[in-house]
Curated annotation (Swiss-Prot):
Gene of this entry: hemC
This protein's name: Porphobilinogen deaminase
Quaternary organization: Monomer.
InterPro entries, alphabetized: HemC, Porphobilin_deaminase_cofac_BS, Porphobilin_deaminase_N, Porphobilinogen_deaminase_C, Porphobilinogen_deaminase_C_sf
Domain of life (superkingdom): Bacteria
GO terms assigned for molecular function: hydroxymethylbilane synthase activity
Reaction(s) catalysed (UniProt annotation): 4 porphobilinogen + H2O = hydroxymethylbilane + 4 NH4(+)
Pathway: Porphyrin-containing compound metabolism; protoporphyrin-IX biosynthesis; coproporphyrinogen-III from 5-aminolevulinate: step 2/4
Manner of cofactor binding, per the entry note: Binds 1 dipyrromethane group covalently.
PROSITE patterns from the UniProt entry: PORPHOBILINOGEN_DEAM (PS00533)
Length: 291
């Protein structure tokens, strides 16, 4: 009997996302034995600093990557938006989920009181919030979803902004006060998509029922744009792609950190060329005098 060991962060959301993959594997072959192995990453342990002050998104994958290298697990599970833009060729992304809701969500405290500040450690979100609500104050917040909700409900923040996909997967949709449209707050590249990583050269047929070619297409466009604009975890760059028939529509956001000016651009092209479309949006964005 074949056995597959799945590596995951130990947060409730990460485990739920891993269970979605395990369910798809069972549908593919009920005889495959599955083992979930959870671990705490460095990014989960360091909560008193924003990601740009430590090592960025790589801190959420380092321990999981090591587990793959050391053959302690066979695949690892990630929120794709939290993975480094420069992917490791020895540990490729081997499957992507269908995209959940890509929007950001506005979460209010259970007591319903409003005030300041709004909690978000994402500069991408902070700058778009300030453009949407001039004069609003924001402050960084770290931790998993449950930790952030506790901080919100204890009165540390008047509201927090989180990815809607995670809130929905946790069954906490009732906590959402409102959704931000993608025109109000452009999401992070690959937001709402779960990624599975494995070792190069191995067989991953058992992920066929889980993998979404559409997610691969839109992620290639989004991540190419953000990577080529030099966007890391703290850089205010965002991208969102949709497929309409044979075309991809790709929207991008860039902030000039010197002037604080936000710029948005949009391009469209053949869905068979997502990487080229990402480069096209980079060229269009960089042609602006404000970049």
């Amino acid at each position: 009997m074949k056995k597959i060991r799945i590596g995951s962060r130990d947060s409730k959301l990460a485990i739920i996302q891993s269970e979605l993959i395990m369910s798809a594997i069972r549908k593919y072959d009920p005889d495959i034995e599955l083992e979930l192995i959870t671990m705490k990453t460095t990014g989960d342990k360091i909560l008193d600093k924003t990601l740009d002050k430590i090592e960025g998104k790589g801190l959420f994958v380092k321990e999981l990557d090591n587990a793959l290298y050391n053959n302690e697990v066979d695949i690892t599970v990630h929120s794709y938006k939290d993975m480094p833009l420069e992917e490791n060729p020895e540990l490729p992304v081997v499957a992507l989920s269908k995209r959940e809701d890509p929007r950001d969500a506005f979460i209010l405290p259970q007591n319903g009181e409003n005030g300041e500040p709004i909690g978000s450690s994402s500069l991408r979100r902070q700058l778009q919030l300030k453009e949407l609500f001039p004069g609003c104050k924001t402050a960084p917040i770290r931790g998993n979803v449950q930790t952030r909700l506790k901080k919100l409900d204890s009165g540390e923040f008047s509201a927090i902004v989180l990815a809607a996909a995670g809130i929905k997967r946790l069954g906490l949709e009732s906590r959402i006060g409102r959704y931000f449209s993608v025109d109000e707050i452009l999401p992070a590249a690959s937001q709402g998509i779960i990624a599975v990583q494995g070792r190069v050269g191995e067989n991953f047929d058992f992920l066929k029922l889980f993998h979404s070619e559409e997610s691969l297409c839109i992620s290639l466009a989004e991540r190419t744009f953000v990577r080529e604009m030099n966007g890391g975890c703290s850089t205010p760059i965002a991208a969102y792609a949709t497929i309409q028939g044979s075309e991809i529509i790709l929207k991008g956001l860039y902030c000039n950190e010197t002037t604080g000016e936000l710029r948005k651009e949009c391009v469209s092209g053949n869905r068979n060329n997502p990487v080229e479309l990402g480069y096209e949006l980079v060229k269009k964005m960089k042609s602006s005098k404000s970049i």
